[in-house]
């Protein structure tokens, strides 16, 4: 069973929980931060962090401060959820309805950890669009990471388990909808993405 990263090394209940906390979750933290802020921004965060703190003794807040400054986003919420809790990330696509010639897609937060979402919509004509839904705790948006049209939607308030995504075209035009096509978000059940 997973335990919070803040558990002292000598106090983990199992070696497995210690291994996950000590090795895997740190790697996933950085990869997923790239999903939140964008990979180019993450690369710059890591360079800034190295340049400012090499041969010194930083703490976790020093890293988050640099990440917030470089990204222009509030990221303390991300650190708090990832380090101090064992809440999981799980998002799913629910109903897809036609609303006046435009598709209305119900997205659900099944897990208890909120995250911003990249939702790629592929149409039957072969074109695609990337819809970006920030979390209201971020106070900012990432920049587009590919050449797809990048549409920033209204923020998803973390207290709401569901969100209705309005898509610019009708249901009949849609071939596929996918949450996190880059697969950098640590979603525990990608089947419903």
Annotated model-derived regions:
Residues 1-106, 110, 114:
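Hydrophobic alpha-helical and helix-loop surface patches within well-folded domains
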Residues 46-53, 164-167, 188:
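Compositionally biased, low-hydrophobicity segments enriched in charged and small polar residues
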Residues 89, 95-163, 168-181:
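Beta-strand-rich binding/interaction modules
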Residues 181-192:
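Short acidic/polar inter-strand loop motif in beta-rich domains
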């Amino acid at each position: 069973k997973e335990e919070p990263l803040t558990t002292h090394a000598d106090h983990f209940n199992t070696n497995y929980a210690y291994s996950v906390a000590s090795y895997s979750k740190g790697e996933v933290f950085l990869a997923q931060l790239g999903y939140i802020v964008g990979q180019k921004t993450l690369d710059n965060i890591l360079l800034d962090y190295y340049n400012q703190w090499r041969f010194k003794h930083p703490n976790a807040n020093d890293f988050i401060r640099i990440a917030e400054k470089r990204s222009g986003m509030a990221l303390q919420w991300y650190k708090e959820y990832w380090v101090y809790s064992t809440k999981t990330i799980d998002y799913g696509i629910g109903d897809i309805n036609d609303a006046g010639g435009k598709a209305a897609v119900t997205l659900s937060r099944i897990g208890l950890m909120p995250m911003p979402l990249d939702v790629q919509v592929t149409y039957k004509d072969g074109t695609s669009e990337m819809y970006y839904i920030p979390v209201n705790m971020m106070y900012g948006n990432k920049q587009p990471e590919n050449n797809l049209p990048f549409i920033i939607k209204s923020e998803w308030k973390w207290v709401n388990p569901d969100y209705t995504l309005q898509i610019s075209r009708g249901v009949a035009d849609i071939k596929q909808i996918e949450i996190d096509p880059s697969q950098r978000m640590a979603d525990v059940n990608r089947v419903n993405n």
